[in-house]
Curated annotation (Swiss-Prot):
Function field: ATPase subunit of a proteasome-like degradation complex; this subunit has chaperone activity. The binding of ATP and its subsequent hydrolysis by HslU are essential for unfolding of protein substrates subsequently hydrolyzed by HslV. HslU recognizes the N-terminal part of its protein substrates and unfolds these before they are guided to HslV for hydrolysis.
Keywords, alphabetical: ATP-binding, Chaperone, Cytoplasm, Nucleotide-binding, Stress response
Presence of the UniProt keyword Disulfide bond in the record: no
NCBIfam families recorded: hslU (TIGR00390), PRK05201.1 (NF003544)
Protein's UniProt keywords contain Endoplasmic reticulum: no
One family name in Pfam for this protein: AAA_2
Highest rank taxon of the organism: Bacteria
Organism annotation: Escherichia coli O157:H7 (strain EC4115 / EHEC)
Induction of expression: By heat shock.
Gene: hslU
Family indicated by similarity: Belongs to the ClpX chaperone family. HslU subfamily.
Protein name: ATP-dependent protease ATPase subunit HslU
A GO MF label: ATP binding
Complexes and interactors: A double ring-shaped homohexamer of HslV is capped on each side by a ring-shaped HslU homohexamer. The assembly of the HslU/HslV complex is dependent on binding of ATP.
Length: 443
């Protein structure tokens, strides 16, 4: 898991997300507390439970982006789910237990990649030997068995040197590779995904591992052989146990749109996709044991981060038991014009940088001036105020409209320099921004 300090985590998030310092600090502290807990003695470590977070803020201010960036920084099993995808146990739809199953699957993939990377050097050596065996077959005795030689032959050493220098990369050889497992597509009703995956695993394992001869260039064969040899060096049972440990000790679940499962007003009959889902989430957040195809997983120390816009519902509309299990509340602020200006220029891969790079592929040089950036930000803010406030997502709509003409004619504009200043933006957007009806449908 990540050993970054809260200050370092916030600094990394600052490269991609503008503002929202309170939210960044909260997730940074929560992530660092995962590391701190692992430094305690085992008895005390078991007693320290994660402080789950509820992020509250209008749409388009950075809640989901914080989750995306956190997943890359955490170096721990991480999954993001939409609360609206689930229904109460016993009804058609996904059960909340599938969150932990998906998290465990993600952990198995992560641990497998780490194990393969750890064994890569040894796998490269074994792959090299297999290719050399094809190029210079080893000597055999009278019974057809390969003789063990004390020292590699001079020819083998010469070919090894050429192989490492890349002189043989384009030479074609025929090698035996593990055949891909038999693919079986099984249709199952919603909520029975676990049974489907188990049946698919069973069919794939029928008949054992088969070899298939393939004719490939040496550089392509080397990549496949390294993967195959690295996979052989990994112990599947150890891998599963390591993955389960990683989920139990370091797992993070991000639940988006949690405000959409709040009960609104009085209603009769079962509320299977709202209050019912909240009741089913309770045991997961509090701590329970979930059965997965890799083994039993305890959720006591998994960190849950929930987020929602709460424009119609309020955090107090969540059932009291769930409110109590999300003790840290963070409010994200609506974005201003100056925030929009910073979003257009400061992030490492800002929208303007992306558009400039895309147009550069056609030989068109785009330059955004400070006045142009300011006018784009003002136009986006103005449309948000007069119609629906969708936060920073409005910048994508406005910029796409602004760049439409250039994008269409880019192949005919090769070699030209185009400056996007305040006058250019006003010429292309002012009429749309001023007309509220047009803004509502076009921007």
């Amino acid at each position: 898991m990540s050993e970054m300090t809260p200050r370092e985590i916030v600094s990394e998030l600052d490269k991609h997300i503008i503002g929202q310092n309170n939210a960044k600090r909260s997730v940074a502290i929560a992530l660092r507390n995962r590391w701190r807990r692992m430094q305690l003695n085992e008895e005390l470590r078991h007693e320290v439970t994660p402080k789950n977070i509820l992020m509250i803020g209008p749409t388009g201010v950075g809640k989901t982006e914080i989750a995306r960036r956190l997943a890359k920084l955490a170096n721990a099993p991480f999954i993001k789910v939409e609360a609206t995808k689930f229904t109460e146990v016993g009804y058609v739809g996904k059960e909340v237990d599938s969150i932990i199953r998906d998290l465990t699957d993600a952990a198995v993939k992560m641990v497998r990649v780490q194990a393969i990377e750890k064994n890569r050097y040894r796998a490269e050596e074994l792959a090299e030997e297999r290719i050399l065996d094809v190029l210079i077959p080893p000597a055999k005795n009278n019974w057809g068995q390969t003789e063990q030689q004390q020292e590699p032959s001079a020819a083998r050493q010469a070919f090894r040197k050429k192989l490492r220098e890349g002189q043989l990369d384009d030479k074609e050889i025929e090698i035996d590779l593990a055949a891909a497992p038999m693919g079986v597509e099984i249709m199952a009703p919603p909520g029975m995904e676990e049974m489907t995956s188990q049946l698919q695993s069973m069919f794939q394992n029928l008949g054992g591992q088969k070899q298939k001869a393939r004719k490939l260039k040496i550089k392509d064969a080397m990549k496949l052989l390294i993967e195959e040899e690295a996979a052989k060096l990994v112990n599947p049972e150890e891998l599963k146990q390591d993955a389960i440990d990683a989920v139990e000790q370091h797992g993070i679940v991000f639940i988006d749109e949690i405000d959409k499962i709040c009960k609104r007003g009085e209603s009769s009959g079962p509320d299977v996709s709202r209050e019912g889902v909240q009741r089913d989430l309770l045991p997961l957040v509090e701590g329970c044991t979930v059965s997965t195809k890799h083994g039993m997983v305890k959720t006591d120390h998994i960190l849950f981060i929930a987020s929602g816009a709460f424009q119609i519902a309020k955090p107090s509309d969540l059932i009291p038991e769930l409110q109590g299990r999300l003790p840290i509340r963070v409010e994200l602020q609506a974005l201003t014009t100056s925030d929009f200006e910073r979003i257009l220029t400061e992030p490492n891969a800002s929208i303007t940088v992306q558009y400039k790079a895309l147009m550069a592929t056609e030989g068109v040089n785009i330059e955004f001036t400070d006045s142009g950036i300011k006018r784009i930000a003002e136009a986006a803010w103005q449309v948000n105020e007069s119609t629906e406030n969708i936060g920073a997502r409005r910048l994508h709509t406005v910029l796409e409209r602004l760049m439409e003409e250039i994008s269409y004619d880019a192949s005919d504009l090769s070699g030209q320099n185009i400056t996007i200043d305040a006058d250019y933006v006003s010429k292309h957007l002012d009429a749309l921004v001023a007309d509220e009806d047009l803004s509502r449908f076009i921007l």
